[in-house]
């Protein structure tokens, strides 16, 4: 009875004391409940002495619940050991989801060895580590940071088999909108080039010079997920990452193609808005140029309807073709094909008119010759007038006398004139007629 009362009033300390006494004094297989009263009093004294020397232990002690079968030693629970990689190089789940990436297969859960070519980048851990990547939007990436507290070690002194940078590289800004992704990729590619990784990036004209190493791939994954949070990625980027979350190079290649496409779209729209045609070039060439522009814009997701396209074309017409602006002004259902049909018709008329003018055109020298000389087709003989002009100083009577004397004088010329006249109008100078000079 006394032993039962003792066990009810002091369950933990009495158990501990009994355990120590049993381990030292009781060496038989006798049941501990069948002990004498003297032994019970001795246990009570020892228990009182133990309580005065040891502090009260919590309920989560290593003593088992069965006080009758107490173990001679308290169990020691070993502390959790680190994984195969150092603890400071791993991220927990909460830290890995700072940028919104999925937990499974996250690049930050990969072991991150110190990347020698860019030593300022360590694996993203706590939120405080983001302070070493300030945002400098609109500035050059290779410009040193204005913050004096962020000083990075010189990577040129690092001895490694990888290429090291010779300058401090400024990180790209953090992406904040899906619409700015292509602009962000331009800065990110510049950042990789400044980090001596330009030879692993494909360009518009050539492929990558070499393949990246495992360390470089790890660096690419960490920097991409750090500066491009998943909630701000375009849908086509998320589709690529859903297949392979480490295929950053495919994202960069497709982004470069989209940049070229955007540049071509801007050039096509500019060309379409500044069209000019006056008939100096063939209508077929003009139609082919405009049709190719409209097809490229349509394939790139920028369709232009007939009404807008016709407005662009008519705005660029000049000269005689300007008339088509007013001829087609009130046509509601006008198409590009109809407008080019009118341009072709006007161009053919213009070319036909030029050909007709070239056949009927005569040179000014030929017209001058026709006005001065002629050919006598009825008579083989030609009459040539005397080019000698009479002397104006002589009187009219003297000049008439000279003419009459010239006509009466025999000579071959005078006979020629007589023979050439007709019979009814023969003139005889028998009455001494005085004719005025220049009347024959």
From Swiss-Prot:
Residues 1-31, 46-60, 137-168, 373-411 have a biased composition (Polar residues). It holds the Pfam family TYA. Residues 363-372 have a biased composition (Basic and acidic residues). It comes from the Eukaryota. Induction: Ty1-MR1 is a weakly expressed element. Induced under amino acid starvation conditions by GCN4. The record marks 401-402 as: Cleavage. GO terms for biological process: viral translational frameshifting. GO terms for cellular component: cytoplasm. Transmembrane segments: none annotated. Keywords: Cytoplasm, RNA-binding, Transposable element. Residues 299-401 are annotated as: RNA-binding. One of its GO terms (molecular function) is RNA binding. It is found in: Cytoplasm. The keyword RNA-binding applies. Residues 1-88, 137-174, 350-424 are annotated as: Disordered. InterPro entries: TYA. Capsid protein (CA) is the structural component of the virus-like particle (VLP), forming the shell that encapsulates the retrotransposons dimeric RNA genome. The particles are assembled from trimer-clustered units and there are holes in the capsid shells that allow for the diffusion of macromolecules. CA also has nucleocapsid-like chaperone activity, promoting primer tRNA(i)-Met annealing to the multipartite primer-binding site (PBS), dimerization of Ty1 RNA and initiation of reverse transcription. Retrotransposons are mobile genetic entities that are able to replicate via an RNA intermediate and a reverse transcription step. In contrast to retroviruses, retrotransposons are non-infectious, lack an envelope and remain intracellular. Ty1 retrotransposons belong to the copia elements (pseudoviridae). Homotrimer. The C-terminal RNA-binding region of CA is sufficient for all its nucleocapsid-like chaperone activities. This is Transposon Ty1-MR1 Gag polyprotein. The gene is TY1A-MR1.
């Amino acid at each position: 009875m006394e032993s039962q009362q003792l066990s009810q009033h002091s369950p933990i300390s009495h158990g501990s004391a009994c355990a120590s006494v049993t381990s030292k004094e009781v060496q038989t297989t006798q049941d501990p409940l069948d002990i004498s009263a003297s032994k019970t009093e001795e246990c009570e004294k020892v228990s009182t002495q133990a309580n005065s020397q040891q502090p009260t232990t919590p309920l989560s002690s290593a003593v088992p619940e069965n006080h009758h079968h107490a173990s001679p030693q308290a169990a020691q629970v070993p502390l959790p050991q680190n994984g195969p990689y150092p603890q400071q190089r791993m991220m927990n789940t909460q830290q890995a989801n700072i940028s919104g990436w999925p937990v499974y297969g996250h690049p930050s859960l990969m072991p991150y060895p110190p990347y020698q070519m860019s030593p300022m980048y360590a694996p993203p851990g706590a939120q405080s580590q983001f302070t070493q990547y300030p945002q400098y939007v609109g500035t050059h990436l290779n410009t040193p940071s204005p913050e004096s507290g962020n000083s990075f070690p010189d990577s040129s002194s690092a001895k490694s088999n990888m290429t090291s940078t010779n300058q401090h590289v400024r990180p790209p800004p953090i992406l904040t909108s899906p619409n700015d992704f292509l602009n962000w990729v331009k800065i990110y590619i510049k950042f990789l080039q400044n980090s001596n990784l330009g030879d692993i990036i494909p360009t518009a004209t050539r492929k990558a010079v070499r393949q990246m190493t495992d360390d470089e791939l790890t660096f690419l994954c960490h920097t991409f997920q750090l500066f491009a949070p998943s909630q701000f990625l375009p849908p086509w980027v998320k589709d690529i990452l859903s297949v392979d979350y480490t295929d950053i190079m495919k994202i960069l290649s497709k982004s470069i193609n989209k940049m070229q496409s955007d540049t071509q779209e801007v050039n096509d729209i500019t060309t379409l808005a500044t069209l000019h045609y006056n008939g100096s070039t063939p209508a077929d060439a003009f139609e082919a140029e405009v049709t190719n522009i409209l097809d490229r814009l349509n394939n790139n997701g920028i369709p232009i309807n007939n009404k807008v396209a016709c407005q662009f074309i008519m705005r660029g017409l000049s000269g005689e073709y300007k008339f088509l602006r007013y001829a087609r002004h009130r046509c509601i259902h006008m198409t590009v094909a109809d407008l080019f049909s009118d341009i072709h018709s006007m161009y053919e008329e213009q070319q036909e008119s030029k050909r007709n003018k070239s056949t009927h055109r005569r040179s000014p020298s030929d017209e001058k010759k026709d006005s001065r000389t002629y050919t006598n087709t009825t008579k083989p003989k030609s009459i040539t007038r005397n080019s000698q002009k009479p002397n104006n100083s002589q009187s009219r009577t003297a000049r008439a006398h000279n003419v009459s004397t010239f006509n009466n004088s025999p000579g071959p010329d005078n006979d020629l004139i007589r023979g050439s006249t007709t019979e009814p109008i023969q003139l005889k100078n028998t009455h001494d007629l005085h004719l005025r000079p220049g009347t024959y």
